[in-house]
């Protein structure tokens, strides 16, 4: 697996350390060794990572009867400094995974691996072009009251198309949302950043703003899930297989 080339980042792409108005609470670049498929997070990454939903958990489409689900034990690994999703089909079931970073937070009943009210989230990622598989790396309300408490997604989209950002507004209507297109592909390395502030969500791709939302913005605590799934709306061909890769991830809370 090719290790992505590094270059000096612009301030807007800075991954490690505090930023004006933001205090860093999480940073990961997968430099603590390889973990084979079936063993993530392993001893090296367990303090900072959860593999997410257990093998066999239906994904979004699987909950509606599609043959798709989360199988971190067959999908996730770390190799050459990246977290890798091996997306493929076994026995007629297309497989994804939804790992979660772990950092101290105030969420209780239930406890969460991560939780914040407002924050800044950056990921450096790429993926093979795989029709039928999608990313929805999202902030989901701790309340599980959706769409009432909203949702924020970036990057999101079918891997054969273009990543976009999306804000589901606080509403009783699931269709009350706004998308922001990047007009890029998943197949090159990109840095996707979400800034969630009181009354405002702004998305950046590679340091450039792709859009701002200010209407009925989520205003209750949310948690981050790197949700990677399939069959929305159509399932991948059984022979379709490939990879999603995460080079690094950084999270900031609002500076006091």
Where are the regions a protein language model picked out?
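GH16 jelly-roll
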Residues: 2-256
């Amino acid at each position: 697996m090719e290790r992505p080339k590094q270059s000096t980042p612009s301030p807007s792409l800075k991954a490690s350390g505090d930023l004006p108005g933001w205090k860093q609470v999480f940073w990961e670049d997968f430099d603590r060794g390889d973990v084979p498929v079936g063993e993530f997070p392993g001893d090296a990454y367990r303090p900072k990572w959860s593999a997410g939903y257990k093998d066999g958990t239906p994904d979004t489409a699987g909950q509606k009867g599609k043959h798709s689900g989360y199988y971190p034990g067959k999908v996730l690994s770390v190799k050459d400094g990246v977290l890798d999703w091996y997306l493929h089909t076994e026995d007629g079931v297309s497989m994804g995974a939804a790992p979660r970073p772990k950092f101290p937070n105030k969420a209780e009943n239930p406890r969460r691996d991560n939780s914040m009210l407002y924050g800044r989230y950056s990921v450096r990622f790429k993926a093979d072009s795989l029709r039928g598989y999608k990313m929805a790396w999202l902030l989901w309300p701790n309340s599980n009251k959706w769409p009432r408490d909203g949702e924020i997604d970036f990057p999101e989209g079918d891997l054969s198309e273009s990543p976009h950002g999306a804000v589901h507004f606080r509403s009783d209507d699931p269709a009350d949302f706004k998308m922001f297109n990047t007009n890029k592909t998943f197949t090159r390395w990109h840095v996707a950043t979400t800034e969630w502030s009181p009354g405002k969500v702004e998305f950046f791709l590679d340091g450039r703003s792709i859009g701002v939302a200010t209407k009925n913005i989520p205003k209750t605590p949310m948690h981050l899930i790197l949700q990677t799934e399939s069959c929305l709306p159509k399932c991948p061909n059984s022979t379709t297989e490939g990879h999603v890769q995460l080079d690094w991830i950084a999270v900031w809370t609002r500076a006091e």
